[in-house]
Amino acid sequence: MIQVQTILKAADNTGARKLMCIRVMGGSLRRYASVGDIIVASVKEATPGGVVKKGDVVKCVVVRTSKEVRRPDGSYIKFDENAAVVIKDDKTPRGTRIFGPVARELREKDFMKIVSLAPEVI
């Protein structure tokens, strides 16, 4: 469950390290984002020589959340951290690698490129 001001780890190689959510996409009163939702974030920490710089405003998709997500079969999935992947306007990742596992919910929300790049889909 991601809301405005939440700090997320960047799970790709765009150069961003930490992201801060500044908007949850999907309506003016939408407060929370979960796995597979798109957010607008500010880059708070970045590596030198990366694609994105500190202070850049980027679109991201949430790939891991500490808050559990309920699946249709009744099971729950949760991760140790909140993480996101920086994306372009056409829902493709800006980086070329994805680090760490991603949730299966991304497949249902048409983020197939992220799913194929991820080392593990849970």
Curated annotation (Swiss-Prot):
<dbReference type="GO" id="GO:0006412">
    <property type="term" value="P:translation"/>
</dbReference>
<dbReference type="GO" id="GO:0070180">
    <property type="term" value="F:large ribosomal subunit rRNA binding"/>
</dbReference>
<dbReference type="InterPro" id="IPR005745">
    <property type="entry name" value="Ribosomal_uL14_bac-type"/>
</dbReference>
<keyword id="KW-0694">RNA-binding</keyword>
<keyword id="KW-0699">rRNA-binding</keyword>
<comment type="subunit">
    <text>Part of the 50S ribosomal subunit. Forms a cluster with proteins L3 and L19. In the 70S ribosome, L14 and L19 interact and together make contacts with the 16S rRNA in bridges B5 and B8.</text>
</comment>
<dbReference type="GO" id="GO:0003735">
    <property type="term" value="F:structural constituent of ribosome"/>
</dbReference>
<protein>
    <recommendedName>
        <fullName>Large ribosomal subunit protein uL14</fullName>
    </recommendedName>
</protein>
<dbReference type="GO" id="GO:0022625">
    <property type="term" value="C:cytosolic large ribosomal subunit"/>
</dbReference>
<comment type="function">
    <text>Binds to 23S rRNA. Forms part of two intersubunit bridges in the 70S ribosome.</text>
</comment>
<dbReference type="Pfam" id="PF00238">
    <property type="entry name" value="Ribosomal_L14"/>
</dbReference>
<dbReference type="InterPro" id="IPR036853">
    <property type="entry name" value="Ribosomal_uL14_sf"/>
</dbReference>
<keyword id="KW-0689">Ribosomal protein</keyword>
<dbReference type="InterPro" id="IPR000218">
    <property type="entry name" value="Ribosomal_uL14"/>
</dbReference>
<comment type="similarity">
    <text>Belongs to the universal ribosomal protein uL14 family.</text>
</comment>
<keyword id="KW-0687">Ribonucleoprotein</keyword>
